């Protein structure tokens, strides 16, 4: 019977379970046979229902024995043991931490159906019964479905470890802990599978061996091992028993040696035997599953410290202080300690290895020093569980000896050299020395202490070669990730606040606190500070000079001057090497606060601080010079359009005399030290003295004291911008200080409304007033000669002499903003001279005075009967425009458009197209008509049409103009009211094919004959400005028909 039982038992032996420490010893301790021992141990191990009589050894035959896993009952214990070993082996063989005790199982939990359920006598071979309610089924799938009706049954079990679950997804998640795969296959190994596993529709029969777990589990840490040998080897880690205690005695005893005496002898002298082939290897290395580099599970357990209950527990502070820069110091550098501390640690290490103690998994086996840290105090003899507690305790002894020592702030971490015990000297110094060096680099030596220069020593005087970092606070023992945070924390104990606000008395221990204070309370002042900080990266000298010059604004300037003797107190050569950087940014940086009225105030404010008295003289002197010079240049650029009488001194108090004295001061400084003059000049050239925002320092506000203000001559209005003053004078005083500029603006407004004239073929040109204007009246001192003689002088100019009149115009037609400040004189003389000049240059013109509107019709019609058939007949326009003879058709047709686009100044004489004598006659008649009406206004009307004529038809180099040296009164007139020399103004009465048609009123007497084809003609009944505007618009409208008209 016994052989039959052993033959049917699972292949996995129960020796580990029977011989292990988890065996529950029975009261019967006499040696028995195997079957009796098995049965007795099974009786002891398999618990029964929680009743007192069940706890007593059952006597066969008196009461039935119930199985704890199912509802079957047995009369003999042997049968019960066989049943448990056969049917419930996975649950039985699991460790105590995973086994389910019988007391906690409900009756429904006992009904567990296996793959091969026992065939009872009352069940047929092809039927399956429910062990909970006894219902039978033909198919195992139906039994599994039926089992789900019993809610409390643990239907799903793990075939690896034996744990059972009520829900399938619990089992699925559990299976991932074993192999990382889904637990779907575990259903096949339950009792009464719903659908057996098939391969190509072939049902796979599961052997009984697959039910058992192929892994061994450690009862302490729960780690799995593939075989029993590896599990036993692993247990040595927990029990701290080496192989010498179990196997070495057995292996050494046959050799006849003295193993015990030899080991004692070696331990006495702290010697280690030569590596034994069996015992030389560490137990940890004998377990490949525990190698963190082999399995992830072992690494995870090793890093979390759950593999073994080590003698030395990893310190939480050291775990938290793993910094990228400091944490690897202990692992990267080997410790080479000397002295008694090293000897003691080596002795302890050898003792441990001689006994075969396995080191902690969390420590690197390559570093023997990781286990050398003592755990007892050598001064008072107290023992501690961890090294960290010993470190905290050692401070008690250090504080007792700190009476006459330095203050804790003299070192970053507060440690004093030579105050630790021999056992703690090496570790404490390791953790402290590098702290100083790294603290200086991380914290930037903010405390101003000579960090990193101390070398801690042991009591024996030996220097520590290996320096590691400790981030423990010497006052409260807290650990920190880096020395930066340790230094900040130490300030809470020492009360040090190195970060001081430069605007108030606030001081902070951290940079972030100061930054928050500045943003909350001094946000306005932060603009200048941010600009200075921005310049720090570009040039350190720039920052020094800016802070030196900004002495009166901030308190930070005082701190700077205390340590800036090398900047301002240096020789001139060194000063000027650093100062030009200020000159480039003097307008953009807040060198002088707005409160400084002049440079004298700057000296006075700078002298208020005693620290600034020595440094005051060199820098502000040159800044004073630069300020004056910049004021002069800015005033010259911004007020160039104003007259000398309107120039007012800047509000900063520097008068014209002071501005003139500045070159002398510059020469004085240059003579004092001429070595830096070239460097200053080279830095002055790219100075940006414009009023606009500076690009190099946009965040710096421009000091208003450096910008000269402009005062209105009519009131007390002041402004920094000429444009604002001009708008103020126009709106408030109805006056424009720049007459020529005003005329130019109006001309641009009227003449440029429609863009470039079509005759220019898209080539846009500026107004003629900005290029060609007649020369002053000095070119024609006396114009009272007879008209024929004047005509005889001016008519013959050929192609080479044509620039005479154009050259005369050039000076007056210069840009108006350059002539705006010139005083105008001799108004009447210029008017008369201009009228005579126009009469001589253009003999056929007839100028009608603008005020005498009643004479205009007469002057318009008088020249007509004089020579109606003459092609050179001249007549005056209603607005006083000068009319010129039109060319014949033969000379007009070939040039065509070239007359307007590509005319040269040499063709001015030939433009009239008629002989000179003929033109003289007509001019005499035309001028005789206009002579009686000569008055002051006549001088105005000539330039009225000067601009429009020049813009619309002629290029700048093609025009022949009268002298434009006119009194200032005409400047109030718009340039569009001034007509250019109207070379083509008058056409022949019969010349309908002229290049221009002009819209003339139908009721005008001369609209059909004389004025036909004439260039813009104004109306008699309209004012000058309105008529001129309409004339210009008519001309623009008819200009598109020029090429066609010339051909007809």
UniProtKB/Swiss-Prot annotation:
Residues 242-262, 315-375, 395-457, 644-670, 772-883 are annotated as: Disordered. It is found in: Nucleus. There is a cross-link at residue 819 (Glycyl lysine isopeptide (Lys-Gly) (interchain with G-Cter in SUMO2)). Residues 440-449 have a biased composition (Acidic residues). One of its GO terms (biological process) is negative regulation of transcription by RNA polymerase II. Residues 346-356, 363-375, 852-861 have a biased composition (Basic and acidic residues). Coiled coil: none annotated. A zinc finger (C2H2-type) spans 65-88, 128-150, 156-178, 216-238, 375-397, 471-493, 499-521. Keywords: DNA-binding, Isopeptide bond, Metal-binding, Nucleus, Phosphoprotein, Repeat, Repressor, Transcription, Transcription regulation, Ubl conjugation, Zinc, Zinc-finger. The modification Phosphoserine is found at residues 106, 321, 407, 593, 662, 795. The modification Phosphothreonine is found at residues 322, 648. InterPro entries: Krueppel_C2H2-ZF (IPR051967), Znf_C2H2_sf (IPR036236), Znf_C2H2_type (IPR013087). Pfam families: zf-C2H2. Belongs to the krueppel C2H2-type zinc-finger protein family. PANTHER family: ZINC FINGER PROTEIN (PTHR45925), ZINC FINGER PROTEIN 217 (PTHR45925:SF4). This is Zinc finger protein 217.
